[in-house]
Structure formats: C-alpha cells, structure tokens
C-alpha cells in the first residue's frame, strides 16, 4: 500500500473534519475536541468562513492528497460531526491510517469502519463521552486503532475493491 512507511508513533492532537458552515458540523467537532485538548487541527475547505482560525485551532493550508494523508497521520484522533452524509472520505482516511474517528452512524464509512465510535445524529453527549474515553483510556484507544485498520482491510482495501467491481 501507498503509505505503509508512515509511522503511527508520536501522534498528537485532534484533526476535525469540516468547517464552520452548519451542514459541515465543524463547530460541533471543535467543541468535542476542545473538551479534551487545545491541540486541534482543521483542513481549509471551500466553504471556509472568515475568522475560523480565531477559534483556537490550527487551520492547515490547502494541500494535495499525499500531503493531507501525511498531515492526518500526525494526529491521534479524528472527529467529524457532519450531518449531511454526502462523502465519507474523512472516516475512510482515518481508518486507512488506523486513527479512531468519532462521527455519525448514518454515514456508511463511519458506521462500518468505526462502529464503537459512531453515534446517532445530533447525539453530542454520547460523542463527548466517546471522545473522553478515547483520550483517557489507552486500552480503548488502541483497541479502536486496531479494529478500524482491520475493518478497512476487510471492507475497503484495494483487493476488496477489485473483487467487488470485478476488475
């Protein structure tokens, strides 16, 4: 695989997905992240709002996909509370790297790849409890790192893709 040489040692902080436009859920993701750390990162996105960088997070510059994966790999945890279930690449990218991601059940990649970390839409209290457990319980954290990597291989690896689409 493409990024096998990336190390999962020395990960720190939280990467949140989405910006502060309501349907991206960035504010909800930020509040959850701030409940455990002030080391919070966010990729710049097309619907970015002026002043987002003043909310106590590090906003990353636009980057290509390789740069994004390398930057995401530096983080301990992903949070993406996006209520519009249109994409799913954030949960998928986290899983590929073995990074636990908290998000909503209705997004298929979230539910399939991070089953212990998925909550019903709008259930931020349950999400907060999961974030705290991941941050403070090393066994739970490691269990979910291992599980998501395993599920990625079973559900979304190149081999599975080729078999599914008969390539």
Question: Residue spans of the language-model regions?
Answer:
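Short acidic/histidine- and often glycine-rich active-site loop of Leloir-type glycosyltransferases
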Residues: 103-118
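Conserved catalytic-core segment of nucleotide-activated headgroup transferases in glycan assembly
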Residues: 2-65
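Acidic donor-binding loop of glycosyltransferase active sites
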Residues: 70-86, 99
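A charged, aromatic-enriched C-terminal amphipathic alpha-helix characteristic of glycosyltransferases
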Residues: 136-167
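Short acidic active-site motifs
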Residues: 66-68, 126
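Conserved acidic donor-binding segment of nucleotide-sugar-dependent glycosyltransferases
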Residues: 115-124, 133-138
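Short alpha-helical segment that forms part of, or immediately flanks, the ligand-binding pocket
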Residues: 69, 91-97, 110
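Nucleotide-sugar donor-binding loop of glycosyltransferases
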Residues: 81-83, 98, 104-106, 123
């Amino acid at each position: 695989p493409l990024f096998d040489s990336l190390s999962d040692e020395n990960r720190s902080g939280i990467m949140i997905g989405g910006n502060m436009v309501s349907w991206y859920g960035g504010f909800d993701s930020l509040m959850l992240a701030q409940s455990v750390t002030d080391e919070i990162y966010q990729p710049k996105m097309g619907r970015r709002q002026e002043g987002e960088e003043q909310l106590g997070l590090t906003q990353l510059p636009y980057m290509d996909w390789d740069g994004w994966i390398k930057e995401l790999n530096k983080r301990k945890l992903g949070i993406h509370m996006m209520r519009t279930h249109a994409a799913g690449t954030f949960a998928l990218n986290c899983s590929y790297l073995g990074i636990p991601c908290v998000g909503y059940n209705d997004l298929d990649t979230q539910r399939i790849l991070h089953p212990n970390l998925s909550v019903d839409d709008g259930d931020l209290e349950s999400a907060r409890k999961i974030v705290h457990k991941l941050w403070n319980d090393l066994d739970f954290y490691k269990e979910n790192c291992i599980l998501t990597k395993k599920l990625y291989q079973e559900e979304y690896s190149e081999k599975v893709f080729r078999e599914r689409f008969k390539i």
